[in-house]
Structures are given as structure tokens and as C-alpha cells.
Amino acid sequence: MLILTRRVGETLMIGDEVTVTVLGVKGNQVRIGVNAPKEVSVHREEIYMRIQAEKGNGNVASGNY
């Protein structure tokens, strides 16, 4: 795992097309903004896991959360 330190307003790049920007820090919560092409799905981990579980049950999940 790569560990990076960023301050509010700073950005990191993932590949050539995905950016992650630290928008704010309040206590133990960090607000981030993700800018990615439409074909790249971006989900919180718990939502991603639910989508994967639904796929395993034959259900179709759509949309970003």
C-alpha cells in the first residue's frame, strides 16, 4: 500500500485521468473529491461490496453512489 500525505486543496493523480483532491479535514473525517472519466466507477467500499454481493445473487446494480 502506498501511503501519501496531502494537505487540504492538494491533489494526487491515479494514472493519467483520475484525480483525488483533499477537500477538507474535520476531526477524524476527510472529505475527498474524485474526478474520473464516466467509464471508471467510483464507489465507497461498502457500496462496492454490496454491488458485488448483488451481482453474485444475479441482481443488477446500476449507478454510482
Curated annotation (Swiss-Prot):
Keyword Signal: no
Sorted UniProt keywords: Activator, Cytoplasm, Repressor, RNA-binding, Translation regulation
One function term, GO molecular function aspect: mRNA 5'-UTR binding
One Pfam family named in its UniProt record: CsrA
Main location: cytoplasm
Compartments where located: Cytoplasm
Domain of life where this protein originates: Bacteria
Cellular-component GO terms for this entry: cytosol
Biological process terms in GO annotation: mRNA catabolic process; negative regulation of translational initiation; positive regulation of translational initiation; regulation of carbohydrate metabolic process
Keyword Cytoplasm: yes
Complexes and interactors: Homodimer; the beta-strands of each monomer intercalate to form a hydrophobic core, while the alpha-helices form wings that extend away from the core.
Function: A key translational regulator that binds mRNA to regulate translation initiation and/or mRNA stability. Mediates global changes in gene expression, shifting from rapid growth to stress survival by linking envelope stress, the stringent response and the catabolite repression systems. Usually binds in the 5'-UTR; binding at or near the Shine-Dalgarno sequence prevents ribosome-binding, repressing translation, binding elsewhere in the 5'-UTR can activate translation and/or stabilize the mRNA. Its function is antagonized by small RNA(s).
NCBIfam families: csrA, PRK01712.1
Name by which UniProt lists this protein: Translational regulator CsrA
Species of the source: Vibrio campbellii (strain ATCC BAA-1116)
